[in-house]
């Protein structure tokens, strides 16, 4: 049986089995009879767990199977809750001395014995139903009606009826034929979310260029392909016949290679899901040097890369823009692009916003509206807009869309399905941070390790189940979004599994769209917009809720004392009128693992958290929190501590040896810096420093002991020169180093050891040619900010210039260079991936420059160039920090404003250089 953690389908059976085993240990001192019952429970639940996993792999379950699955899953939750309460009662009793502690233990044992009896009866009932109805014998035998494949219609759609196809069609043809005279086999992979029109695009391109080839074929592969049939279909297309004796993969591959040996062919392989399928298919694609072409379509990024890894390209299909979406939508409903009644325009735009440019979604919803007896009914249109998830579940007109969404979901592993469903917790259109999601998944028990959770996030991106929202400075995905239709699908699935409950304005107890039957709420997402919605929960039981997520006015937040067994607590509050609300109750939430609070004052709460022994992640955002935080009030096993930068940290930080993330605290006590060296597991460190020489003496020794550090960011008061110059050896896994307030005389020698460094922000006194060469050796760099206060003179030529030679900085995408004059020179081949260039300079020093952005035309990927020109030299120097006014390395000190002529001269020189660029990057020149 595959190992599962907490799962949407199986509930908490996996951790439950471990806890039942733990109860048998001597320290709990249970009676022999109770231990016997626990062993029996464990055996029964283990058998049920195996069947639940089997059921989870079955696409269609009958009602009997679904009902049994739901009851066993809910039973597992109830059993784990019982054990957790018992263990906490024993811990509380241990904390009491003498007779009182003994009585508490006796009471706890009595309660667990009674509860075990009750649970055993329920388990035996479930086991009896399993045996009586022989549920495992029917697994896989039930099958719903075959879903219509929307790709079939895509193959026979007339080009004249398509919208927004011309530009992607031309681009795909360009990629296919860009090396028309090249004899090698050329593969272009089209990749994108389900329903984006990949099949339609591939078919249109196939039809447009097929006359240029000797033979063509168009075949579909699908999720669970019969590769003999796929190969037969290819052979049928290029040869016209398939003898019956060719019925094995190897025979078909050999015949295809023979047929294609001397032909220029065009083959479209549609809907590939695995690299294994591609690896077999490509064996039949003869590399005959006749200029053959292959188009593949897939939802999965890795598969697209594998298909086009040699002599090929990946084309990521884009959603329709607003205009084309509207044209397609209105044409399907009203048979005209201009016939939509004025009264429906706003709701039409609202529906299209949910579709987000996905053609299949637009056509599916349009068909639903077009087939309604009152096509112009505003009430019906608004109902579709507001309750699309319900329509998705039951309306035949949306069968295509439901099928496409379910294909991607059903392809996920059990763990990935759970992680995917969890995204429905967040409000619509949320930008979801990866690091936050990773911490939540671990806290919920879906994943054991954060590294595994990060790989799951990447896999969901790779499979196009979620959309990238933003990248960080290192070029890694920082956040994601969920397509509105996918969110509706997730909410529908989660309701089926009673995985989470979302409520917005209407009471939960009256909202059948978010709860299933009489099952208890396990994860609750409360999303409110105004203070009139403060009774939506009514009298619903909340003690068993494992995850509570709140977005809304503080007055609407329920009492936290009602959430006895909560593990994950997220409070995003606005319009708060009170100081503390019910925050002191948090200290009694003994299972709390993740706590994030935004918009509330937490001064008193932060003094009461040391009893939360399971707490791993604590994040406080905003809320006017300031003052001091003594680390002795924090749980010693905390992994992540993120607090506002105006909250001062003090105490023995070294006792928190499990800490992995420490973000943003205000540091004025040198003891904190000295204690950092004990945090051997620390990976991300971001400090707001305020100190003098004692800080400089304490910081480096501690950093030298942090071997696991991945990211270091310092902010605040500028420290002395070269306080980090002797950081030897630096942590070899470091990928971010942002130390603008720790200036260096020159580029330190140790920086060449940082092979994984992707983001670097530093301040220098001098940048000679050797310094540029040292920085260029960091081939992984994606983001670079360089602020030079002194001299950049080339000692060999005496020119004031920084030359970036060919092949330097191969992966750099963002560069900020601050020096008195924009004296960068780019040779051909330098910075081939640079997209954004920002220059900060001073108009008064313009006469010193020997070159102004010379060779900028060689930056082939440049998209945007920003130039900040300071009229006042002292204002320019102040941007460097408290040592900026100290003259070093031949610096010039200017006190007067630069003449208008100098400013205009520099603007003209910069504009002239940038205008040479053939790619016409966007240009912004700002004067300060």
Name each model feature, range by range.
Residues 1-29, 100-101:
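Membrane-inserting effector segments that mediate pore formation, membrane fusion
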Residues 20-23, 28, 45-62, 234-246, ...:
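Non-catalytic, charged helical/coil tracts that couple and regulate nucleotide-powered enzyme cores
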Residues 24-93, 355, 827-834, 846-849, ...:
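Extended, amphipathic alpha-helical segments that serve as helical scaffolds
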Residues 45, 97-194, 200-204, 295, ...:
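Regulatory and partner-binding modules of innate immune sensors/adaptors
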Residues 75, 82, 88-97, 104, ...:
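Surface-exposed helical/coil interface segments that assemble multiprotein signaling complexes
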Residues 122-196, 200-214, 220-223, 233, ...:
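N-terminal flanking helix/linker immediately upstream of nucleotide/cofactor-binding cores
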Residues 257-259, 265, 288-289, 503-522, ...:
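Cross-kingdom leucine-rich repeat
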């Amino acid at each position: 049986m595959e190992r599962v953690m907490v799962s949407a389908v199986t509930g908490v059976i996996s951790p439950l089995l471990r806890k039942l085993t733990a109860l048998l240990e001597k320290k709990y001192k249970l009676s022999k009879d109770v231990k016997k019952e626990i062993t029996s429970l464990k055996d029964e639940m283990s058998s049920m767990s195996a069947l639940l996993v089997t059921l989870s792999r079955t696409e269609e379950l009958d009602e009997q199977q679904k009902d049994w699955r739901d009851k066993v899953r809910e039973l597992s939750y109830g059993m784990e809750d019982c054990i957790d309460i018992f263990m906490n009662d024993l811990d509380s009793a241990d904390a009491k001395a003498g007779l009182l502690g003994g009585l508490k233990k006796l009471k706890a044992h009595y309660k667990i014995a009674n509860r075990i009896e009750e649970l055993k009866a329920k388990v035996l009932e479930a086991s009896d139903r399993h045996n009586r109805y022989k549920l495992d014998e029917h697994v896989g035998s039930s099958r719903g009606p075959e879903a219509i494949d929307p790709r079939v219609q895509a193959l026979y759609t007339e080009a004249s009826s398509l919208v927004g196809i011309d530009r992607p069609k031309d681009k795909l043809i360009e990629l296919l034929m860009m090396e028309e005279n090249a004899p090698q086999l050329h593969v272009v992979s089209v990749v994108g979310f389900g329903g984006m029109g990949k099949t339609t695009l591939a078919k249109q391109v196939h039809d447009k260029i097929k006359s240029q080839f000797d033979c063509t074929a168009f075949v579909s592969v699908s999720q669970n392909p019969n590769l003999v049939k796929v190969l037969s279909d290819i052979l049928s297309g290029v040869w016209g016949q398939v003898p019956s004796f060719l019925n094995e993969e190897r025979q078909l591959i050999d015949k295809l290679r023979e047929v294609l040996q001397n032909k220029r062919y065009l083959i479209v392989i549609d809907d590939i899901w695995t690299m294994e399928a591609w690896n077999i298919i490509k064996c039949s694609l003869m590399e005959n040097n006749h200029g053959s072409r292959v188009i593949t379509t897939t939802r999965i990024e890795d598969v697209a890369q594998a298909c086009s890894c040699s002599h090929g390209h990946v084309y990521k299909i884009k959603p329709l823009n607003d205009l084309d979406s509207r044209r397609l939508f209105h044409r399907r409903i009203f048979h005209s692009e201009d016939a939509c009644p004025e009264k429906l325009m706003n709701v039409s735009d609202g529906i299209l916003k949910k579709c987000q440019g996905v053609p299949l979604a637009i056509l599916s919803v349009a068909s639903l509206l077009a087939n309604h007896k009152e096509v112009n009914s505003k009430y019906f249109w608004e109902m579709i807009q507001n309750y699309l998830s319900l329509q998705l579940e039951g309306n035949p007109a949306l069968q295509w869309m439901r099928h496409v969404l379910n294909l991607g979901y059903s392809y996920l592993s059990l763990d990935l399905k759970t992680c995917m469903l969890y995204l429905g917790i967040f409000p619509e259109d949320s930008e979801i941070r990866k690091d936050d999601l990773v911490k939540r998944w671990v806290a919920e028990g879906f994943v054991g390790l954060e590294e595994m959770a990060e790989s799951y996030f990447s896999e969901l991106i790779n499979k196009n189940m979620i959309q990238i929202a933003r990248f960080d400075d290192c070029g890694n995905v920082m956040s994601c979004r969920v397509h509105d239709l996918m969110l509706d699908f997730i909410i529908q699935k989660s309701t089926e599994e009673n995985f989470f409950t979302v409520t917005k304005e209407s009471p939960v107890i009256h909202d059948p769209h978010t709860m299933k039957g009489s099952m208890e709420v396990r994860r609750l997402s409360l999303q409110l917009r105004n203070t009139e919605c403060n009774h939506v929960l009514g009298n619903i039981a909340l003690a068993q809720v494992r995850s509570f997520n709140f977005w809304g006015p503080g007055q609407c937040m329920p009492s936290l004392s009602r959430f006895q067994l909560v593990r994950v607590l997220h409070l995003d509050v606005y319009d708060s009128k009170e100081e503390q609300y019910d925050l002191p109750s948090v200290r009694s939430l003994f299972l709390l693992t993740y706590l994030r609070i935004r918009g509330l004052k937490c001064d008193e709460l932060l003094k009461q958290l040391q009893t939360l022994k399971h707490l791993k992640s604590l994040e406080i955002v905003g809320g006017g929190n300031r003052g001091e935080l003594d680390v002795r009030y924090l749980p010693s096993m905390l992994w992540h501590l993120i607090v506002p930068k105006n909250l001062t940290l003090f105490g023995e930080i070294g006792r928190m040896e499990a800490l992995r993330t420490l973000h943003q605290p205000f540091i004025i006590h040198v003891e904190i810096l000295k204690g950092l060296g004990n945090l051997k597991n620390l990976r991300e460190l971001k400090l707001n420093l305020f100190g003098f020489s004692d800080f400089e003496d304490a910081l480096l020794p501690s950093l030298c002991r942090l071997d696991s550090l991945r990211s270091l960011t310092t902010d605040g008061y500028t420290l002395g020169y070269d306080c980090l110059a002797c950081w030897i050896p630096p942590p070899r896994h470091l990928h971010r180093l942002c130390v603008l307030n720790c200036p260096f005389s020159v580029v330190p020698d140790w920086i060449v050891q940082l092979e994984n460094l992707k983001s670097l922000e530093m301040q220098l006194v001098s940048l000679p040619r050797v310094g540029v060469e040292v920085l260029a050796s960091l081939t992984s760099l994606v983001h670079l900010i360089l602020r030079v206060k002194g001299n950049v003179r080339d000692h060999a030529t005496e020119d004031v210039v920084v030359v970036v030679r060919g092949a330097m900085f191969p992966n750099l995408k963002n560069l900020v260079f601050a020096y008195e004059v924009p004296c960068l020179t780019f040779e051909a081949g330098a910075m081939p991936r640079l997209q954004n260039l920002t220059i900060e300079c001073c108009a008064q020093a313009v006469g010193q420059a020997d070159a102004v952005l010379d060779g900028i035309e060689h930056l082939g990927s440049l998209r945007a160039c920003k130039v900040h020109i300071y009229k006042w030299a002292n204002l320019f120097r102040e941007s460097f920090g408290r040592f900026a006014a100290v003259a070093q390395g031949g610096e010039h000190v200017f006190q007067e404003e630069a003449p208008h002529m100098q400013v205009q001269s520099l603007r003209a020189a910069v504009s002239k250089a940038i205008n040479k660029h053939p790619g016409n990057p966007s240009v912004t020149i700002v004067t300060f």
